[in-house]
Every structure is written in structure tokens, then in C-alpha cells.
Amino acid sequence: MRKWIILLLLPVVSFVKNKEQQSWIRINQLGYTPDGVKVAVWCSKVQSGISSWQLVDVAAKKVMFTGKVGNAFGAYGPFKQTFRLNFSSFKKPGRYYLQVGGAKSPEFEIGNDVYKGAADFCLRYMRQQRSGFNPYLKDSCHTHDGYVLYGEKAGIKDSTQIDVVGGWHDASDYLQYSATSANATYHLLMAYRDFPKVFTDEKKANGLDGKNGIADVKDEAKWGLNWLLKMHPKDNWMFNQLGDDRDHMGMRIPKEDSFYGKGFERPVYFVSGALQQRGKFMNNTTGTSSTAAKFASAFALGKELFKKDKEFSELLDQKATTALQYAYIKKGVSQTASVRSPYIYAEDNWVDDLELAETAVGNLFKSAAINDPASRSSTAELYQNAFEFAKQEPITPWIGADTAKHYQWYPFINLGHYELARQLKDKRRDTVIGYYKQGIQKVWKKAQTNAFYRGVPFIWCSNNLTTSFAIQCYWYKTLTGDKTFSELEQANFDWLFGCNPWGTSMVYGLPSWGDTPVDPHSAFTHLKNYPIDGGLVDGPVYGSIYKGLIGIQLKDADEYAEFQSDVAVYHDDYGDYSSNEPTMDGTASLIYLLAAKEAESKGGFSYSHGGIIRGDSTQKKIALVFTGHEFAEGGNFIANTLQQQKINASFFFTGDFYYDAKKEKLINQLAKAGHFLGNHSQDHLLYCDWNKRDSLLVGKQPFLNDLLGLSERLGHISDELNDPPSLSKSSYYFLPPYEWYNDSIAAWCKEYGKQLINYTPGTLSHADYTTIKDKNYRSSEIIYQSIINYEQNNPAGLNGFLLLMHIGSGPDRTDKFYNRLPGLIKYLKAKGYQFQTVAGLLSLN
């Protein structure tokens, strides 16, 4: 009987096997933006082809788009055939999935907000990694750190106690490294500098719930800076790491460690520039530069971003200088130390660190040069030093290579190239940007041969490399406007969130609905089932690396077994520390990348006190705005310039201006030419106190009289000129007198159907009325350079700018800025900007 049962079951078993899934569609589980690159990857275990595929609306269950496949990419890893499915031309927001035959992708969203909050989400992991007071545990740990080793050259006896409590634990172990901490701090500072609107304020400085008026990312960066200050307490004292691999003797929730033979103290290793222990051997330390230069860079950028905290800012300024000096004690690398095993951060490059440090410190001198011309020569010298270092390592050595040692080339990309290119104005800028392009081309040469566009090597922490390379592509695009590598950039980003052979996100808990790590190599999850939200895991490694590592043993069955190959191995398993351990510095880099992605996709307006102060910062469009009250001597010149350049601008005048018979001809000329004429108030009143902005100087009714008093006059002008399009929204937008208002004024505008706007801050264009007798006087050259500098030094340039100037400045100012208008317009045109009226710019939303 048993034989018959077996025989009867055989066809069923055979049928089930034939129906096992043979093909998959990999997507970015976070989703895609309407105007962004959108590519999925179809991959199959059988050698077969496909000709077309469909994009299906989840709610309507309707095929919305049918695409034809391009060239087959062939075998990759565990797959015998792969194709790229490009649906970038489909832009309608919604929830969709892709299907090809029997293969169906996970559902995903297309929308402008798909990346919203992702950067802030990853900050959760950074807070959870805090040493000292840990806000996640609501408890303190490692409060006895530490005792000094290798400090004899600086006159520090071995085992001398020093306070270095704080900072971040490096990964799932609790070691702390100056190099990774300084790099993480710099990335967080950059993220806030470049994308301040992305981040929210939901936590206090200690990481607990509550607002403190400071963006959470800035709080986190300051946590890093405070620890770095402890690690460089004196001009001739600097420390490289806290703890060593004796930490690996047991997994535990961070509290106090007694592994080191001195109670609960942990060793803190001095930056000596000399060889230090590496297990049974010695490391290859050659100098002080790599670590000290990272300190200098973080301190310098921190100084710029914490100017309002004068005492802290001045301390960072001082430490940036001493850290840079420390970097030159002995040129070379400072590798980390270990006691029990040979695993260390064996960094081999340092010129990239000095390039960034010289640039960052140069920026401090540049800021000082505004009031101290003597600093200009120092700035130029520092930038030239940085350029010389850039030439020594034009391309980060792992880029284009098949392998590298663990953290051999660190940071994983050259941040100095980006920061230096933002400052240079001559041919050196093109040279430095060219280095980025050469590196990207090296990766592209490998990536274009496979459907995942994978050109990053599968070495330890490959996800960190992937994140950094995507940032390099983004920076190249930002610096040049060249989108040649946008699809490669997006492919690396997509890889991190599911468009990879395993179909999984590499970030714990992101997205919340997706396939993400659940069993990382972490004590928090393994011992207590605590989530480690936002942590970026190390990522896949070559099969050969995985097989050669010490102490790896999976604790559960491998759910990704059918997707493993010699090309790459990844496990969501606590036992695999090579591919599934999150790292603090990798997560900090990802925070920058996610912030960039969110900023790119926002496409919204910027507001201040209820007023719009900037249009869409992702669009290369700008509005020239001229205000007028008493003077108008520049009117004819401005009008003629705009006519010659064939562009339109916006003019906001007061009642005194509009009712002045002497100005009637100019007003009509501007309106007939298609320029926007707007409301700058009836009587040019000051609405609120200069020093106490919340204090109103007018009541609601006097304000409304000032706001609405011009409606009749603007209506008459419109009637007289047969309602030209330029006046169709003239009474809707209101630019307040003195460009000064508060939330109450903006709310009253909204109540009466008006939208308050103001100029975009960042340049000195609005200072073109000042006279040489004024304390705040700015010459036309200084004003012009402030505009050019802002355009060149900020990732979004002047995108969406409301660039405000005055139609006249009166007889006391002889240096008329409007005379620079032709040159300014030509410059902006050459940069690719499109000129729009205020109505045109702000109707884009």
C-alpha cells in the first residue's frame, strides 16, 4: 500500500516543483519620485527571455503602462538571465506593482513624499549608539572611560585616567574610533548644512523626547563634536580609539565593561604616529595625518554651523587649527589597534583627509576675510594646499578595483573634492570635478555589464561603499548639472532598499512595510528584541570572503539560500557579522544620502514666519524682484536691460510710487512689457519691532488698510491696459514694506486671500540701497560676489530664488548695483537658469 501512495504522490510532487518560482522582479521598496529615475530588475533562474512587462495600479487593478525590454544582461550571481525594466517616463503618483508573466513585484509608491522622514528615521540608530547617556535605554554606560596607552611621547604615563565619556559605539560592539566618529560627524553636519529643511526637531539634546529649537541632526552632530573635543583635549594630545577588540569577548547590552583589567575603565589609544599593537603583530601606522585631519575638518565645519553658540564656536575654531597642526607632526596614517585578533581599521590613505582639512579650515579664514582682508591670502594658500593633496589622490583607490582591505581607503569617497570644488573659481575646479567623473566612469565600466548596475566591490561593508558612491554621483551631478550618471546613482540607491538579488532592504525597519533585516548581528535585537531602527547593515560580501572569515556560524536556516552565489553572499542572521552588522558611520553617510533624496523630491516652497521665501529648489528657475517706494532712477535702465535680455521680472511698489504722476510712464511701460506688478503696501509702514519680531507696531485694521489700499489702484492700472496677463495676480502676492513681518502679518494676509512673500536669504542683493555712510554699506562688487558665491557654493544654487533688488537707491548712493544687472543676467543664463515672474515661479507647485 505504501508503494502505491508514493507512486500516487509523485505526479503531485513533480507538479509542485515545476511551479516553484523561477523569476522575480526587484524594486526599491521605498518607492520612486515622479520625475526621478525608475528602474526595476527582472531576474530568472532559467535561461529565457521576456519581451514586455506591465505596470499595474493596485487600487484600480488596471494596467497603466506597458514597457518593452531592452537588451538582455545575461547571468548575474544566482540568476541565468536578467533585464532592466525602465519606467522613468511614467510619472503619475500612486501605488503600483510590476508584472511579467508569473512574476510580480512587491507593491511600491510613486510620489513626491516617498523619501520623506527617512533621514530622520535613521537618526534613531545614531541616538541608540550613544555612549555615556543612552537615550534609548534611558540609562548611562561606559562612564569610567578611560586610561591612556601609548602617550609617553606627550608625557602621559600609561594608565593615566582621562575623561573621554560620550560619543557613539562604532557598531554592534562598543569600540569607539576617532576616524569613524569624525567622519560621521562631518556627514551629519553636511546634511544639515546642505538640506536644513529636511530635518525636524522632535528630540532634546540628550536624545529624549521634546523639542529644543534645534534640528535633531544638528543635536546629533554636536554629540559627536563634544566627544571629539574630549579626544583632543590639549594642543599636543589626541586620541585615536577607545576600547579594543577585547570588547568582543561577549555580547551584552551596553553598561560597564570589565574586560580590560582596570575595573570599568577602557583604554584610550594615543595618536602617536608610531606602530601600535595588532593582535600578535603590529599595525602599519606611519603618521598622525589621517586621524588629526578628520578632527580638523569636523571642528571647522562645526564652527560654521554653531556660530550662534559663540563660546562653543570659538572653541571649535581653535581646535580646528590645532588639529590641523597635529596632522603635520608626522605625515602618514594612524591605524587602529587590537589585542586578540588581527582585525583592525587598516587605513592606508591620508592625503584625502588633509585635502578636506585644508579646505574646511580655509573656509574659516574665508569667513574671517569679510572683516579681515589679511585672511584672504591665508584662504588662498589653504585652498592651494588642498588642491595639491587632491592631485596626489585624484580617485579613491577602491573605486574601479575588485577588492580592498577592511577600511583601507577611508572615508569611502573623497569628501575634499566636493568641498574644494565648491570654493574654487578657476580651472582647478574643473580639474577636481574631473577626478569625480573619472572615478564614476571606472565604476560604470563594470556596472554597465550587469542588470543591477553593480560596479562596487563586495568587500566588507560594501553597503557603506555603495552609499558613498551614490553620494559621489550626486555631488558630481550637483557640481556640474550633468545627469549622465543619474541612472547609475539611482541604481546604487535602489540597491540599498531592495533592488538587489535578495530583494531586501539593507536598513533595519525601512521601509516599515518591506522586507528588511530582522535578525542583525546586534546585542539589542539578539538579547532583548529591541529594534535598531535606521541602522544600515554591512551588506553582501564575496563568497570567498565569507568562507574565509573566523567564527561565523548561522543560527537559523538561510531564507535567502537560493539567491546566494560566489559573486555575493548576504544573510539576515545574527551569526553573520560580515554582512548583517550595522555600523554607525555607514548610517551617518546614509543619512546624508537620504536627506539629498528627500530634498530633490520635495519640489515645494520654503517658508519663514508664514511667508514664501523661495520657490522650488529642485528647479533651475529664478525670479528677479525689484521693490520701489521713493526712488526710481534705475527704472529705465532696468526696463531696457530686461527687454534686451528678453526676460520678465517682478516689480513691487508702494502707494506713494503707484500714485506718483512722474512714475506713471515707467509703470505703464513695465506692465505693457509683461512684467509683474505687485503690492508693496499702501503707506510703507513698519509692522513689527526690529529687535522683538513678535511685537506688532500696528493693529489689524491699520495693517489691512495698508494691505488692501492698493487693490483699487492696481485694478485701475489693469483696466487702463486692457487687463494684461502680467497683472492677473498682482493683488494676490504681497511683499511687505522693509521686507519685515511676523507670523501675525502673514496670517492676516492669508485671512484676506493674499499670499505674503519675501526675498530668499543668503545673498546681499537686498543691500543695494545702502550708502557709504551706513554701517551696513555694501558695495556693488561685494553684493555681486555674494550672489555668485552663493550660486557656486550651495548644492541647489539659486534654484527657486526670489532675488530682491531696488529700482532706485537715491542720490546718496552713487555705486548703483543695477548697473551690474546685464552681467548678472548673462552669468545666470550661462548657468542655465530660466527667468520667471513671481507668479510664474510660485505657480509651479
Segments (PLM) and residue ranges:
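Acidic, glycine-anchored loop motifs typical of Ca2+
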Residues: 206-214
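Structural recognition of the beta-strand scaffold that forms the well-ordered cores
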Residues: 185-192, 228-230, 239, 355-356, ...
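Aromatic (Trp/Tyr) and acidic
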Residues: 29-101, 106, 112, 127-183, ...
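Carboxylate/His-rich catalytic cores and anion/metal-binding grooves
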Residues: 217-237
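Catalytic domains of cell-wall/extracellular-matrix polysaccharide-remodeling enzymes
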Residues: 637, 659-662, 684-804, 808-834, ...
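Active-site beta->alpha N-cap acidic-glycine motif
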Residues: 604-694, 709, 713-732, 827, ...
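N-terminal carbohydrate-binding/catalytic regions of secreted carbohydrate-active enzymes
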Residues: 37-68, 72-77, 332-350, 611-667
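Bacterial Sec-dependent N-terminal signal peptides
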Residues: 1-21
